[in-house]
Amino acid sequence: MDNHNSSHQLYKKAMALVLAGGRGSRLYNLTDTRAKPAVYFGGKFRIIDFALSNCLNSGIRRIGVVTQYKSHSLLRHLQRGWGFLRGELNEFIDLLPAQQRVDEEHWYRGTADAVYQNIDILRSYGPEYVIVLAGDHIYKMDYSIMLRDHAQSGYKCTVGCVEIAKEEAYAFGIMGIDENRKITSFIEKPKKNAPTIPGTTDRCYASMGIYIFNSDYLYDLLEEDITNKESSHDFGKDIIPRVVSENQALAHPFSMSCVPRGEGIEPYWRDVGTIDAFWEANLDLAANMPELNIYDKDWPVWTAQEQLPPAKFVPDRNGNHGVITNTLASGGCIVLGSEISKSLMFSKVRVLAGCKIDQCVIMPEVVVGENCRLKKVVIDKGCDIPAGMVIGEDPIEDAKNFYRTDKGVVLVTKKMIDELKEK
């Protein structure tokens, strides 16, 4: 059987489960009203769109999305933008809120518990393979290649991994592997002595939060884990170490299935779990030749498409045209005679005359008043920035009025602006 037909058969035997219930507390006020996977990204998308688009582009069209924390924004996005799959062809995105399966007092207590509470639903669909995905990372990956790697390996679990510098290991689940990619150890966020990639002393394989299981094996693991009172019911802390101890875990390097892939191409994967990382990943897209290609017709990123007019850039009342460089502007934006560089503007942003905006991420429906100066600022949806406001130049004032990171990125929300206006 050739690879195409083999992959097609595997598609039909697999179901993806996207874990999208996390709060993302390190994003601070950006997740006050929405779950992390529902946070805006890249000028027009939501973070979860990348995992879901990978599923569709990989041929995986049976998808469950597990939700919990402040899920209204996420559910509305999925209903408006992802309702085009055809149930009569056994294609679907099934929305799975917390079931309180264990008792009426507990919601999802961990990533493994989130899957366990939907185990009956999974069984009803009868997949041979379950693909467990984190819904809060930015990357493009062909899951069908990983699925084929898993099916051909004979292992019961395959873990997607990305190469990182050893000094970054403290923030990830790190795996040790042998020359055949069998995972021999798995340590969640090691503070020291992280296992390195064979043949290197300064590189590690970090878990991407992507797992493929033989379904029956996964169900057995979850049913055993739920009875363990000492378990935190988490894949990284409990399930994967158990699989490793049973010699059933294979490592799948991201370089094998990243999109695009090939010699000289650096795989792009970002955990946007902090304000700094979120800001940096967004601004990556403003580069002349960004590492993440969102213009790729062969691997599109799908999302909800609001019907809006094109962005418009016009002179101010004095005829000043302004200058726009290395900037992405979504539909419905209007900019009057301002200077904007290396920034992203989501839909329906208004920038009035005389502004200077540099390295900013401006979310939908923001109005920037006249003569504002903004540098290294992330502005949440719906903010009305008063005329003449300066943000990003005075660290003391920024920290007093807004949230400022150690790297100097300033987060501005509607609540912060409203409180500032009341002073």
Swiss-Prot record:
Protein name: Glucose-1-phosphate adenylyltransferase
Gene for this chain: glgC
Keyword Nucleotide-binding appears in the UniProt entry: yes
Protein role: Involved in the biosynthesis of ADP-glucose, a building block required for the elongation reactions to produce glycogen. Catalyzes the reaction between ATP and alpha-D-glucose 1-phosphate (G1P) to produce pyrophosphate and ADP-Glc.
Signal peptide annotation: none
Taxonomic classification: Bacteria, Pseudomonadati, Pseudomonadota, Gammaproteobacteria, Thiotrichales
Family in the record: Belongs to the bacterial/plant glucose-1-phosphate adenylyltransferase family.
Domain of life: Bacteria
InterPro entries: ADP-Glc_PPase, ADP_Glu_pyroP_CS, GlgC_bac, GlmU/GlgC-like_hexapep, NTP_transferase_dom, Nucleotide-diphossugar_trans, Trimer_LpxA-like_sf
Residues holding alpha-D-glucose 1-phosphate: Y108, G173, E188, K189, S207
Annotated coiled-coil segments of the chain: none
Entry-linked CDD domains: ADP_Glucose_PP, LbH_G1P_AT_C
GO biological process terms on file: glycogen biosynthetic process
